[in-house]
């Protein structure tokens, strides 16, 4: 079969590209290795819609984050959880950024940073500053349903699940992709596989990116009433974040120190658990 675009990966970026190209009348094929969309990075993360607060040593990154924050909110506001206080704090110990520096950074980036008493959230002396900020979380399942509804209305867009590319080759001016029992061609191939990018590079004979892979655990939990409408992120070092997880009613708990369990610097991620689980680590 011949298409205008072949997209590898049915996460947020893959389905976004499919919806945009399909709405423009192009014939699109999406190949997803998993049995459903949004099963990896789009869902397995903090669900934080970044405003730029994480980047006090890069104004350009912070400003770009703030710009795309507003764009994401405008386009996908229906999947956001916005009704909570997002608090950033700077630790008084082992932090690369203190309260005064964080204030200056936010002012220069043009993002909200309103002082609140650190003792409202932390034991005395632990943090030298705490700030009310503007940041939201998104619900991946709500966003997934929206994309699938939009794509279902586009007969020129096809999604094949449980189809991992086995072979990619040039066929004249087109790319020929074989995935299981399917072979398709298109003049344009989009790799939207995120952490799977080097798998695709290997099929193409391209050099791999130097990627650090981490096997991470994100804890989803219920919190007491005092924290239900609060998110807390402690900067700027080996600290933690506790924040609402989309519209689920749960909070995610992550730690710079304890969330990553293992690290791989191989071109394609390799972890000991893969040998016991058919190549894919599971909880």
Which residues are covered by each model-predicted region?
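Short beta-strand to alpha-helix junction loop
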Residues: 56, 90-99, 130-149, 283
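Dinucleotide-binding Rossmann-like beta1-alpha1 core, especially the glycine-rich loop
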Residues: 46-129
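Glycine-rich FAD pyrophosphate-binding loop
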Residues: 22-44
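Helical element adjacent to the flavin cofactor pocket in flavoenzyme catalytic cores
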Residues: 131-188, 192-202
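Hydrophobic anchor at the start of a short beta-strand
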Residues: 26-28, 113, 189
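N-terminal Rossmann-like FAD-binding beta1-loop-alpha1 element of flavoenzymes
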Residues: 3-29
């Amino acid at each position: 079969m011949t298409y205008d675009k072949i997209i590898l990966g049915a996460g947020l970026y893959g389905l976004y590209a499919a919806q945009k190209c399909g709405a423009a009348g192009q014939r699109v094929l999406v190949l997803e290795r998993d049995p459903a969309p949004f099963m990896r990075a789009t869902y397995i993360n903090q669900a934080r819609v970044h405003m730029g607060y994480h980047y006090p040593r890069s104004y350009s990154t912070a400003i770009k984050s703030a710009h795309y924050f507003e764009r994401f909110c405008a386009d996908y506001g229906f999947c956001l959880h916005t009704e909570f206080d997002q608090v950033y704090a700077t630790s008084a110990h082992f932090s690369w950024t203190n309260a005064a520096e964080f204030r200056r950074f936010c002012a220069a980036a043009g993002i909200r940073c309103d002082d609140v008493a650190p003792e409202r959230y932390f034991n005395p002396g632990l943090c030298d500053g705490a700030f009310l900020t503007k940041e939201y979380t998104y619900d991946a399942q709500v966003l997934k349903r929206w994309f699938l509804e939009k794509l279902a209305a586009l007969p020129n867009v096809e999604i094949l699940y449980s189809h991992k590319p086995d072979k990619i080759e040039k066929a004249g001016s087109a790319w020929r992709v074989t995935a299981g029992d399917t072979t398709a061609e298109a003049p344009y191939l989009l790799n939207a596989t995120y952490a799977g990018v080097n798998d695709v590079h290997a099929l193409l004979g391209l050099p791999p990116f130097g990627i650090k892979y981490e096997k991470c655990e994100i804890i989803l939990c219920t919190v007491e009433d005092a924290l239900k409408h609060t998110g807390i992120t402690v900067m700027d070092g080996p600290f933690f974040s506790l924040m609402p997880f989309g519209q689920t009613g749960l909070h995610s708990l992550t730690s710079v120190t304890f969330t990553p369990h293992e690290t791989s610097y191989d071109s394609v991620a390799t972890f000991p658990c893969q040998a016991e689980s058919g190549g894919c680590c599971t909880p």
